[in-house]
């Protein structure tokens, strides 16, 4: 007995278009590519923003302002709640231990501690930045906070 659940509905699978097989086939000669020009050639790919050879919009419009990307500091964010689960009382939280415990990936240059979650253990925190609320929570739990400069690492 056939399993009718495996049969695709009518019109779901369309037949492949066969081109370049004689002019009487309807798609012979130019194979549906039109006549000559860049689009008719193999490997044709006009880049994004190409306007047929005229000066593209992104080059006609003047540049304004500046980008601060090169100078932006990128921080890996770790919340106080995550420190609660991973660290034992009295342990030191620094770049090395955060990478070892898998809370931070090694490629991010700076680390910042934020205040989401609760902390009950006293821990020593030595990272680049700590938010004011996170610092309060760490100190209320009996820990200490030391913000280090990137050059010291």
From Swiss-Prot:
Alphabetized SUPFAM superfamilies for the sequence: Ribosomal proteins L15p and L18e
Keyword hit for Heme: no
Chain positions covered by the region annotation Disordered: 15-42
Cellular component GO terms held in the UniProt record: cytosolic large ribosomal subunit
Protein's job: Binds to the 23S rRNA.
Similarity remark: Belongs to the universal ribosomal protein uL15 family.
Protein name: Large ribosomal subunit protein uL15
Lineage, top ranks: Bacteria, Pseudomonadati, Spirochaetota, Spirochaetia, Spirochaetales
């Amino acid at each position: 007995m056939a399993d009718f659940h495996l049969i695709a509905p009518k019109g779901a699978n369309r037949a492949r278009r066969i081109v370049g097989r004689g002019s009487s086939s309807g798609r012979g000669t130019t194979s549906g590519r039109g006549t000559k020009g860049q689009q008719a050639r193999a490997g044709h790919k006009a880049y994004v923003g190409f306007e047929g050879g005229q000066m593209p919009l992104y080059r006609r419009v003047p540049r304004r302002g500046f980008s601060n990307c090169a100078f932006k500091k990128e921080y890996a964010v770790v919340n106080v709640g995550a420190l609660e689960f991973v660290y034992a009382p009295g342990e030191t939280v620094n770049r090395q231990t955060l990478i070892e415990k898998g809370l931070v990936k090694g490629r991010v240059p700076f680390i910042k501690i934020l205040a989401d979650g609760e902390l009950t253990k006293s821990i020593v925190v030595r990272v680049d930045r700590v938010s004011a609320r996170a610092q309060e929570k760490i100190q209320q739990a009996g820990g200490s906070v030391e913000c280090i400069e990137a050059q010291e690492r």
